[in-house]
Amino acid sequence: MRNDISLELASRLTEQVKTAFENGSLLDAVTPVTQDLLKFWFMGPYTEERSKNFHEGQKQSILNIIYLHEVLQVTTVEEIYRQVAPDLLAECNLSDLAKEKYRIPKYAVKMATGTGKTWVMHALLLWQLLNARHEEQEERSGRYTQNFLIVAPGLIVYDRLKDAYCGRLKENCTERDPFTNDLYLHKDLFIPPAYRDEVFSFIQNNVVTKEEGIGRKITGNGLIALTNWHLFLSDEEKENMDSDSAPSIIRDLLPITPGLSGGNVLEALDRKYLRGSELDYLSELSDLMVINDEAHHIHENKKQGEIEEVEWQKGLNKIAHNKGGHFIQIDFSATPYDTVGSGKKKMKCYFPHIISDFDLSQAMKSGLVKTLLLDRRQELTDLANLDYNALRDERKKVIGLSDGQRLMLRAGLRKLQILEEGFIKLDSKKRPKMMVICEDTNVTPFVESFLKEEGLAEKDVLRIDSNAKGEVKEKDWMQVKERLFNIDKYESPKVIVSVLMLREGFDVNNICVIVPLRSTQSAILLEQTVGRGLRLMWREPEYSEEKRENRLQVLVKKKAPKSYIDMLSIIEHPAFLDFYNDLMNEELAGIDEGDLPDGSNVTGDIIKVGLKDNYQDYDLFWPLIIKEQEEEIHPSEIDINRLAPFTDFSYEQLKEILAKPGESFISYAVFCLKK
């Protein structure tokens, strides 16, 4: 059995769908509502008249799911294989596909970090919502729904979901502005004008957050429920999440808490009592679409073949039970696989329901993410035998940083300084940042202290500590999230120090240097760590040509970069050599063996030229041609009832003028004499 068979499935499906969309057969087979959406999203003149459009990876993911669900009308993962590529079933784990969790319409979207999977999520939600609302009541197919559950893996992604559907927080306020949600901000991309009022009304009235309580807030016909994975935790796991803290011990001893904190108010007691009823409420819905963001958290594989379901998946199984084809699950992840084995036998086992694959290679070559650079400095290669783990005493307590770790941090700071000096000459608003990933929270204070010893101020370092599962306590999170989410806007902080917390949802653009002090061998953790810095920093069109030439220089010609514009530098860690070699072999990374000669070369050949002092005296403008003028000729029909009467001659006169019987006509030949 192949462990990557679903990638082959995704490739074959994509070819089928491309052909069907290009020849028009896909449009002919879908509902009128879906036709409206697909034309608005992917066809002219709409795509020519706006500045933002879906890129090819987003488009293909949307089309593939619509094709499977609406055209082929699959009801299980096995059915996807049977209808798209039946020969691949011989290489599948059929006992795996027979599990309850795959006996539903279930689709996994594999998209590289930073390539906009949230936009795909929005589009698919709109497709389901509008079809459900416009289906004839007596002819309902059961394949569309107005009920949605969107699940995040942690606090960062959950906050991003609230931004996307509830709107961003107002300045210095806990209130959200509904006119800043994604669908309103980008309505010209997502929603055809005829559907906008009903979509905006639905979003405003039917979004339910975990704080409001799923099943407690009264909504109209349908809901968009936002939550994170804690919804699916068992009571035992909830108790164990922070079991070593004093407050949790007190909660165990005194579940009804006296005092001044409001622990006994009715709302608080209701929340505790109703916690389990959220799953019951979702289970009782007649239909539902579940969207899992960062879905690699759902699976747990200790061998090639799952041993035990994680609580997240158990909860989904309960919700899906008895819904059959009225339950749809869409999983999004840049890394939809489990890692099995160890050492040379380590391999990736991809989820069996992957239906689209827009990988890092495609994203990088398309210029949708930064280009990776392995910072292989002379001092690092010469001292490869240094210890790169934190110093610990005989009781394994961390007592300091090793020489190798100090060396890596200095290399990262040096690169950050070079970028700061070069970028500010071109654009003072471009502020590069560095991220340090530590092995555990006992190391982060030593890293913070060392960075300050190297000259950084208190405000320049933001330390975020999390527990073993990568979670920050909610009260701590409230203190750091404002600084964290606005990090692109301000000069400080310059360096973010974390353990697991920032693996997902950290959607900032200015991370230009990553120092991976954490020596984990997990492929998923490595890819997720690298993914934190992939989002583009220099998005303006004037930099496109410079970036294209740089990608060619680094990825194809295997030479040093000419500039650092939209380059992500990873300070090389000896424990990750295999991972780095894989990146190099797949043409996903280049090597930077030293600093550019001086800061002026950081931005390559681009120079900043100011305006003339009297530029306002020049009345210049550049017309934007949206559509060339064309004469449209329409055939017209003559309505005899609307013709004016003919009065120039009488009826008798006309009879005299007309030819009489027996008249003959004589033809004359005309000659042209030539000199």
Please report, for each region that a protein language model flagged, where it lies by residue.
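Helicase-associated low-complexity regulatory tails and linkers flanking the ATPase motor
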Residues: M1-L7, S11, N131-Q137, D159-D163, ...
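Conserved pre-motif I regulatory segment
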Residues: L26-K110, W119-V120
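Pre-Walker A (Motif I) flank of P-loop NTPase domains
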Residues: L97, Y102-A108, Q146, R431-M434, ...
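The conserved Walker
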Residues: T113
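Conserved glycine(s) of the Walker
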Residues: G116
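Conserved SF1/SF2 helicase motif Ia
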Residues: H122, L126-D159
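A short beta-strand element within the Helicase C-terminal
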Residues: S498, L502-S519, I524-V530
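Residue-level detector of conserved catalytic or cofactor/ligand-binding positions
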Residues: E656-A669, K674
